[in-house]
A protein has these predicted regions:
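Mature N-terminal segment immediately following signal peptide/propeptide cleavage
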Residues: 61-102
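Alpha-helical subdomain
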Residues: 235-406
Length: 406
C-alpha cells in the first residue's frame, strides 16, 4: 500500500519546515523520539496543528480612520437653522478667556459649535483635538474652507487675504508679525479681487478633495463659493444675518470681532498673534480639528464624538454650546441633549461655555454694550442640576449656576 504524504504549506519546503520544527521541539523528548523513529510526516501534521495554538498572539491595533472617514463616521443627517451663521454674533466671546487662564483649563479635547469663534477658544485652551458639531451641513463645508486656508496660508496675513478675497500687494512676509489692528487696516485699504477669489476657490476645492480626501458634490462647491464670495463682497463689514429679518444693529461686524479684547483689554482673537495662528495651523495640518454634522440632541453625533474621545484616552476640557440650549428648550429636546452630555468623558474641571441672550431678563454678568453674555459653568454642575429637575426654562440654564468671570 502506497503511503500518502501529508501536504505542506507551499511557502516552505519540507526540509526547511522540518528544520524549524527540530529547533522548536529540541526540548521535547516525546517529539524528538518521534523524529528519530522515522515518523516525520506524523510529526509534521501534529505540529502544524499544535504550533499555531502555542504561538504568542500579537495585539492588532484598531484601524485609525482617515479625516474624511472620521467625519462620515461621526456625522448625522443635517438639519435646518434660520440663518447662514457665516460669522459669530457674540461680541463678548473673549470675556471668559482670562478666567479660563486662571482655572488653568488646558489640553484635553474641545467641542464647539458654529463658525470662526471656535478658533479663538481652541487657541486659548490648546486641546489635543477639537470637534465642531453643528446641525447645518453648510457649517461643515465652511470649516473645510477654513481648514484649507490654514493649510495654504503661511501666516496670518495670507490667511486673512484669502479669507476676504483681497490679495496682498506687498511681500506677505512683511506682515508675518503685525498686530491684528495692523492686519485689519491692511484689509481695509485692499480692494477685493474676483480673479483672486476664483483662484483661491480652485486651490481650496483641490485641497479639500485631494489632500483631505473629502469629495465635494456640485452643491458643496456652490456652498463654498457662496461663503468665499460673501466674505469678498462684504469684507470686514460682514455680520450675522437671519433669513427672516435684516441684521440687527447689535450684531457685530467681523472687524469688531477681530479687534475685540478680553477683560484686561488684551486682544485674544485667534489672529491676534502669529503664535496662536501657527498652533491652529498645526492642528489643521494634523487633521485634529474635525467638523461634524449633527444635532446636539440627536441620537448619534455627540455620543459618537464622546466615544471617540474615550478611545483616545482623553476627556472633554471645554464644550462651547453658544446659545443652542435656547432652541433645544423651544423644541422640547433639551433633555435628550443633557442625556448626551452625561455620556461625554469628563473630569471635575470640564467646563461649558455658553452664550446667554436674556430676552428681557438681564444677567448679573452682563456688560454694558454687549447684547450677549458669555458664561462659564462646570459640566458636572450642569448635569447635577439637570438630574435634579432644576432646568425648566432657558433662564434657569443661564442663571441658576455659573462661574463669575469678573
Amino acid at each position: 500500500m502506497r503511503r500518502t504524504r501529508t501536504p505542506l504549506p507551499k511557502t516552505q519546503s519540507p526540509a526547511t519546515l522540518l528544520g524549524v520544527m527540530r529547533r522548536a521541539t529540541s526540548k521535547s523528548l516525546f517529539i524528538r523520539q518521534l523524529l528519530q523513529s522515522g515518523r516525520a510526516p506524523c510529526v509534521l501534521l501534529l505540529l502544524l496543528v499544535i504550533l499555531p495554538a502555542c504561538t504568542p498572539r500579537v495585539a492588532i491595533r484598531p484601524r485609525v480612520p482617515t479625516f474624511a472617514q472620521l467625519i462620515a463616521q461621526l456625522s448625522e443627517e443635517g438639519g435646518y437653522f434660520p440663518s447662514d451663521n457665516l460669522i459669530s454674533n457674540e461680541l463678548g466671546y473673549q470675556k471668559v478667556l482670562q478666567k479660563l487662564d486662571e482655572l488653568n483649563v488646558r489640553g484635553g479635547v474641545y467641542i464647539g459649535v458654529g463658525p470662526e469663534q471656535n478658533f479663538t477658544y481652541i487657541a486659548a485652551v490648546r486641546p489635543t483635538y477639537a470637534f465642531i458639531l453643528d446641525i447645518r451641513r453648510e457649517n461643515r463645508l465652511q470649516h473645510l474652507f477654513y481648514k484649507a486656508l490654514f493649510v495654504l496660508a503661511r501666516h496670518r496675513a495670507e490667511y486673512l487675504a484669502m479669507w476676504l478675497g483681497r490679495p496682498l500687494r506687498e511681500p506677505s512676509d512683511r506682515w508675518a508679525h503685525a498686530s491684528v489692528a495692523d492686519l485689519v487696516r491692511l484689509m481695509e485699504t485692499t480692494p477685493p479681487d474676483s480673479d483672486y477669489v476664483r483662484m483661491t476657490l480652485e486651490r481650496v476645492s483641490a485641497t479639500i478633495e485631494r489632500r483631505f480626501g473629502v469629495p465635494l458634490t456640485p452643491e458643496d462647491r456652490r456652498s463654498i463659493a457662496y461663503i468665499a464670495q460673501s466674505f469678498s463682497e462684504h469684507g470686514l463689514d460682514i455680520r450675522y444675518e437671519s433669513h427672516f429679518r435684516r441684521s440687527w444693529r447689535q450684531f457685530p461686524t467681523l472687524r469688531q470681532l477681530l479687534l475685540e479684547t478680553d477683560l484686561t483689554g488684551r486682544p485674544r482673537n485667534f489672529l491676534a498673534t502669529e503664535e496662536s495662528f501657527q498652533f491652529l495651523k498645526r492642528l489643521q495640518e494634523q487633521d485634529r480639528i474635525i467638523p461634524v454634522t449633527g444635532d446636539f440632541a440627536g441620537p448619534k453625533a455627540l455620543r459618537a464624538i464622546g466615544d471617540y474621545i474615550r478611545s483616545l484616552g482623553e476627556t472633554v476640557s471645554v464644550f462651547y454650546v453658544s446659545n443652542v440650549e435656547y432652541y433645544l428648550l423651544q423644541n422640547d429636546t433639551f433633555a435628550a441633549f443633557a442625556e448626551n452630555v452625561k455620556t461625554l468623558p469628563r473630569t471635575e474641571r470640564s467646563l461649558i461655555i455658553r452664550s446667554y441672550v436674556g430676552y428681557g431678563i438681564s444677567h448679573p454678568e452682563a456688560l454694558p454694550g454687549y447684547f450677549i453674555t458669555t458664561l462659564l459653568q462646570r459640566m458636572n454642575e450642569f448635569i447635577r442640576l439637570y438630574e435634579a429637575g432644576e432646568y425648566r426654562t432657558y433662564w434657569d440654564v443661564g442663571l441658576l449656576d455659573y462661574i463669575p468671570v469678573r
